[in-house]
Amino acid sequence: MTDTGREGLQNREEGFELPLMSLREVVMFPRSIVPLFVGREASIKAIESAISDYGKKIFLVAQREPELEKPGPEDLFEVGTVSKILQLLRLPDGTIKVLFEGLYRARWDGTADAIIGADDAYPRVRVTRIEQESSEDDDEALVRATHEALDEYGKINKKLAQETLVAISALSDAARLADAIMPHLKVDYRRKQELLEVESGAERLEKVYELLQGEIAVASLEKRIKSRVKNQMERNQREYYLNEQIKAIHKEMGREDDPQAEVNELEARLAEKSMPEEAREKALREMKKLRQMPPSSAEYTVVRNYVDWILDLPWNTLKETEIDIDNARSILDADHYGLEKPKERILEYLAVQKLVNRLKGPILCLVGPPGVGKTSLAKSVAKATGREFVRLSLGGVRDEAEIRGHRRTYVGALPGKIIQSLKRVKHNNPLFCLDEIDKMSTDFRGDPSSALLEVLDPEQNSTFNDHYLDMDYDLSQVFFITTANSLHSIPLPLQDRMEIIRLPGYLETEKRRIAHDFLLPKQVEAHGLAASNLRISDNAVLEIIRSYTREAGVRNLEREIASVCRKAAMQVVEAGDKEKTLTVSRQNLGNFLGVKKYRHGEREDTSQVGVCTGLAWTEMGGELLVVETALMPGSGRVEITGKLGDVMTESAKAALSYLRSRSDLFGLRPDFHKEIDIHVHVPEGATPKDGPSAGITLATSMVSALLGIPVRNDVAMTGEITLRGRVLPIGGLREKLLAAHRGQIGKVLVPRENEKDLKEVPGEILKGLEIVFVDHVDEVLPQALMAQAESIFGGRTQSTPLYAKLRKDAQDGGATMPTAQ
């Protein structure tokens, strides 16, 4: 210890230096002896320094916030207690047990400047002793009243040792009496700190007396409660003893099956179960019925099953969920390749739920063709949010009772599938995937889609009423995700309750990536092969996609890869060499999968009159659609074949009406159609086709046939036509452009209003295509027909019919005329 420090210990006015140790939720009072466990490194260093350099004296002060591990000067109170270390015991875990004796109050500045040696392992501060005011004569009444209150408190609180009471009763000084009583009162450490800072002994004792009176009131109440509980327990024990005697009597009489025991068990379960008051009251009423029924009656079993259902449901049981956006994004990316927009929308939804901390919001509906990952995406969302995953298939459901349950009046009645699933998962906040919601149907038993209106309405599903339960059940904590292949069969009111997220079909590039990264490793492992046993080239995978599957998803692609793996496994086993390596290329793919199953539309080999290439959208993706028009002598009949739907048939009629209305523009007589028959055919006649987007394709094919001008075979088009020749926007542009790219089309004519949709088309597809935006058929024909634009629309004189001139242009092939590629 320094000389300055020794002088400081004797100079109370100027203050003296001591090590400081902060306490958590403990306030040290003068003349009190308290054992403390010390584990913080700075506190241990302060104690060691106090023993070696400061005569075992240390300054103990309480923290304002006990959670802080390393409190700063501003985190400590200014008033503490100079204490002496009486005993120290080091424990095996590195902590120490120290016995402190409080000596007197002291104060420090409570600022960073007051700390001496701020860089040391423990703080040292300069403290000033707080002098104690002397007691006055009129304090005697307060001291006597406090002694009486302490005696009363000691009679109620048996935890207070008799020796402690005797020692305290010998004190007559107000200040010392207050300091002696305070450590034994159950009050918050902040309240104790307030009393420590009171310098007047009489004032401090008065506050202690008030606290003592409050503790007496609380202790008296606790005593009454304990007495009441004890009496209740004695009464319960007496009832238990009598019930056991009754059981023993039944056993002696050979009646071991006591029906009341079963009801008692149900009542015990009910007492432990957390549930709404309505459900509890209903269960109690049903149990009263059970007590009055003979177990052999049929009604007894019905009531017993009903009570079991009430007790088994997770009314208020919620599973801990955690929404971590980064983790959710990682899970979605790991489980699904592509699908960026759907995944982004799901992450946005989860982010909102994390901020508002409630689930009330839109119900998500994932719409897309089969095999694109709708159900597995819902499963990944459950995994990302930590919820139980429940899948309920609605395909073929036609009975409303499947959703709402049967009324108890029916034999074998049960709750609906939703309540049954909640009982199975034992939590009230799972993720519910209502699969194939578009496959429900209606019959005389009701409309299940109407029952779902309540389930999928965030404003109503907190009071979902199942017919079997016949009471409200809260579904607002359930995360609902529905899936569908199409929205056409979903009623509009049900659609209105859901937020639609569309999952488009995969592009070929995405399928190829999915095959290499997900499907191939999965199937290789499933078939017992090593990764080195089988190698499939990119071209082979692309050939499988194009020639052996026709789908928007990847289910059939996985089946074909599994077939390749089976063939490979057979060859490895037959060769008897587990290290054998098989390479599948485009050339030998047929050895594994046989002949090709499908052919995708490709462009025509040559440019022909009346043959025009259009673009179509199907659930399996985009396709090239060839339209053929033939003319023959006749009486004006129009024949349309190829299994076309009503909309496509009407598009053909609209295209023909447009041509007739502008016959003079093309150099045709107004009554040209009366002398010929027009036959429009769309090949692959067994395949149904419909939709308005083939309008300009039909019109171009007819113009080509009427004028005898070939249509360029490297041009494809899509767009709806009006009677005025306007070109209207279409859907599925992404898939249609993929089909054009795959079919080696060079130029695609697209409605101008679809220009905004190009943002969703991958750049690798656009790179090989020339996209031309059109507003009118007048812009389509010069791009598609093998003649100059002036040749089609330039001549209007009757002396030189355009029909003959354009045919001559097409046959001669002028230098400025586009050539077919």
From Swiss-Prot:
This protein's GO CC annotations: cytoplasm
PROSITE patterns: LON_N (PS51787), LON_PROTEOLYTIC (PS51786), LON_SER (PS01046)
Compartments, as annotated in UniProt: Cytoplasm
EC number: 3.4.21.53
Enzyme type, top EC level: hydrolase
Lon N-terminal domain ranges (all copies): 18-216
Binding site for ATP: G368, P369, P370, G371, V372, G373, K374, T375
Record-linked InterPro entries: AAA+_ATPase, ATPase_AAA_core, Lon_bac, Lon_bac/euk-typ, Lon_lid, Lon_proteolytic, Lon_Prtase, Lon_prtase_N
Induction pattern: By heat shock.
UniProt domain Lon proteolytic: residue ranges: 606-787
NCBIfam families (alphabetical): lon, PRK10787.1
Family classification: Belongs to the peptidase S16 family.
Protein's name according to its UniProt entry: Lon protease
Organism: Nitratidesulfovibrio vulgaris (strain ATCC 29579 / DSM 644 / CCUG 34227 / NCIMB 8303 / VKM B-1760 / Hildenborough)
Lineage start: Bacteria, Pseudomonadati, Thermodesulfobacteriota, Desulfovibrionia, Desulfovibrionales
Gene name per UniProt: lon
